[in-house]
Amino acid sequence: MKRLPVIGIVPSQNTTEKMVSFPERYADAIIKAGGAPLLLPLSGNPHIYETLFPLIDGFVLTGGNDIDPARYGAIRDSGKIDEHTPEREELEYLILSYAYRFDLPLMGICRGMQMINVCLGGTLFRDLGDQFPGMVRKGINDGKDGLPQLAHWQPKPYSEPTHPVTILPNSKLGKLLGVQDIMVNSMHHQGVCDLSTRVDAVAYAPDGLVEAIEVRDKSFMIGVQWHPEFFTGRHRMECVFDALIEAAAHCHTHCGERGSVVITRSEPVGIQAQWPEITFADCI
């Protein structure tokens, strides 16, 4: 029997109850596209991932709690910031480091897109209501004043798209979707502020907020601010999952022993150190 591409997924974390949770929509979208989802545990022991990562052909970083502002050099001054999930954040940083090093396909959804940007050195608006509208009114978006303000946390059911995004036609995402404008759902109060120097913005909301990013010089490392898993089976956006699985299948066939590594993790040193130091040593 042909082996299905395995997609590692990070669960949501409830630090108070010491629980993880996982919406089945993500797994359903991966299965429908022809992949096999694998829910990853949250562990501070890197040897767990030395065993698991060689089995994995691609990753999905899902939605969830806000990222700790300290990870991108900001202060924790907003009462609107969710509970932080340090174990999850450090697993996602490990995954991104691994996928970046070995060019494994990875898709970030909502918070997952924000995590790609943060892990690669970008920053976030900690709360769009407090920060982003004022920035728009000052005209930082290509010098345009008076851009429309959107409800980025929609009141309608999440299975209903509520606002348009414009996609750069020459981007990977634009070529996948085959359209320049598409309607999406929206359920977030944070967003990309300063882009990582290794990331390109490839889609925007009408108010100028970044809605999709791609990591430069990587085969398939894409983030979207919306939730395409709500549209599986009835929307053009499911082709993004199809493309992820296709890229993962190619990686499984052609990447050989890229995953056989020893992972070394050391604690951050110094006040400016925002992430643990991760190194990968090839097994011989």
What are these regions (language model features)?
Residues 1-109, 118-125, 129-183, 189, ...:
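N-terminal beta1-alpha1 cap of cysteine-dependent amidohydrolase-like domains
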Residues 222-225:
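Active-site-proximal beta-strand elements of phosphoester/diester hydrolases
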Residues 113:
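The feature captures the ABC ATPase H-loop/switch
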